[in-house]
Amino acid sequence: MSSDLDRQIEQLKRCEIIKESEVRALCSKAREILLEEGNVQRVDSPVTICGDIHGQFYDLKELFKVGGDCPQTNYLFMGDFVDRGFYSVETFLLLLALKVRYPDRITLIRGNHESRQITQVYGFYEECVRKYGSVTVWKYCTEIFDYLSLSALVDGKIFCVHGGLSPSINTLDQIRAIDRKQEVPHEGPMCDLMWSDPEDIPGWNGSPRGAGFLFGEDVVQKFNHDNNLEFICRAHQLVMEGFKYMFNETLVTVWSAPNYCYRCGNVAAILQLDENLKKNFAIFEAAPQESRGAPAKKPAPEYFL
């Protein structure tokens, strides 16, 4: 299997899709591995933590240039692999293939875009249909989304989650008790982990996103104290500098999609933690235009002419 898998990884690294039958086999293997992982997946340092990628495949390649290749570097990706960029299929399948090949060297947690509903609106569904001619690959991938961990805990000290905290979660054990194998709900603790944002407010507030909550410094202090955490690491929000500390460095946002949507002009960052949890933010820019090949924004095939 690993020689097949290595060939598929090489193919995906060239931004070439693999066969539908190979996607099916890959997803089936990934499912077995992800089933064994917890809602709060344990990760050991040293580790490199990454934020949203959003189908920006050539920028993911830049990320690996800066951070090192997997398995030499131990990676944790905090979700939102798909949607908005042109290469969600290649991006997600490459990360999934690396997960199956090196399960202990790459951790993938779920973002709010790892959802059937959201991907039908923001591009992944349409891209799967365009590249494979049917919805089958989208179905295989969205089924895998249901098995992804909800969060990760580095050395018992650093809590990593896509979005943020929830008013219905006080302890990590309450996250461990969630049944995660489902579509992202519209409300409740699982939804909040993927949708919430930190804000300079006291306590909790409704979120303008229409899902999740806004939460303030006091909430973070209490959560970190009660769970013996040093800080919270999350993604979910574009930050122009690639990373942003809040609340006296008890929370950091990491954003890993440079020049987001190919027009925002932001840089991206990854957070490198050494074995003593010393932090280094590596900043990178979007891949140069000439390394990208032609953009894949072909019009959808006109089946009904």
Swiss-Prot record:
Which BP terms does GO give this entry?
double-strand break repair via homologous recombination; regulation of chemotaxis; regulation of sorocarp development
| Protein name (record) | Serine/threonine-protein phosphatase 4 catalytic subunit
The similarity annotation says:
Belongs to the PPP phosphatase family. PP-4 (PP-X) subfamily.
Catalytic activity, as annotated: O-phospho-L-seryl-[protein] + H2O = L-seryl-[protein] + phosphate; O-phospho-L-threonyl-[protein] + H2O = L-threonyl-[protein] + phosphate
What does the record give as the function of this protein? Answer: Required for development, chemotaxis and the expression of numerous genes.
* Principal localisation: cytoplasm
Q: Which cofactor does it need?
A: Mn(2+)
What keywords were assigned to this record? Answer: Cytoplasm, Hydrolase, Manganese, Metal-binding, Nucleus, Protein phosphatase
Q: Which InterPro entries does this one have?
A: Calcineurin-like_PHP_ApaH (IPR004843), Metallo-depent_PP-like (IPR029052), PPA2-like (IPR047129), Ser/Thr-sp_prot-phosphatase (IPR006186)
* Source organism of this protein record: Dictyostelium discoideum (Social amoeba)
* EC nos: 3.1.3.16
Q: What's noted on cofactor binding?
A: Binds 2 manganese ions per subunit.
Which EC class does it fall in?
hydrolase
Which GO MF terms does the UniProt record name? Answer: metal ion binding; protein serine/threonine phosphatase activity
Q: Kindly give the SMART domains that the UniProt entry links to this protein.
A: PP2Ac (SM00156)
**PROSITE patterns in UniProt:** SER_THR_PHOSPHATASE
Q: Which residues form the active site?
A: 113
Pfam families xrefs: Metallophos (PF00149)
User: Where does it localize?
Assistant: Cytoplasm; Nucleus
Q: Which residues hold Mn(2+) 1? A: 52, 54, 80
Its quaternary structure? Serine/threonine-protein phosphatase 4 (PP4) occurs in different assemblies of the catalytic and one or more regulatory subunits. Probably part of a PP4 complex containing ppp4c and ppp4r2. Interacts with smkA.
Specify the superkingdom: Eukaryota
The Gene Ontology CC terms held by the record are: cytoplasm; nucleus; protein phosphatase 4 complex
Kindly list the positions annotated as binding Mn(2+) 2: 80, 112, 162, 236
